[in-house]
């Protein structure tokens, strides 16, 4: 894990990027923007102590949204390999549930 600091307006990742890390927002504001959003306001807002960027890592697929800092922000980044090592130690039922939930969210987004 590593601590990263971002400035307001800076992208943490963009839609289409390979998901290499999962993020935990420690401080600041991060907006999640779907590719179809041409507005200034995000589709979703990430709050402190919330995780984001997980779907691309869980599914090994390109990111479906962009994450942009709405203020200066500090995040903890967990690499794909660190995440997978933690998941492998988890109960097999929880591993399967995690993948199913992620796929369900992606399917719902694809239908919009």
State where each predicted segment sits.
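Cytosolic regulatory regions built on CNB/CRP/Popeye-like sensor folds
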Residues: 1-112
